[in-house]
Every structure is written in C-alpha cells, then in structure tokens.
Amino acid sequence: VEIIANDQGNR
C-alpha cells in the first residue's frame, strides 16, 4: 500500500 501524507493528521 502507499501511505499518503495529508493535513488531516497523517503527517
């Protein structure tokens, strides 16, 4: 799977 960083808490 690929993990996509976003501004909703994944960073």
Swiss-Prot record:
Q: Does the keyword Nucleotide-binding apply?
A: yes
Tell me yes or no: is NADP among this UniProt entry's keywords. Answer: no
Cysteine pairings via disulfide bonds:
none
Question: What keywords tag this UniProt record?
Answer: ATP-binding, Nucleotide-binding, Stress response
User: TM spans, by residue?
Assistant: none
Which molecular-function annotation in GO is an example for this chain? ATP binding
Additional info? Answer: On the 2D-gel the determined pI of this protein (spot N164) is: 5.4, its MW is: 73 kDa.
User: What family is this protein classified in?
Assistant: Belongs to the heat shock protein 70 family.
Would you tell me the protein name for this molecule?
Heat shock 70 kDa protein
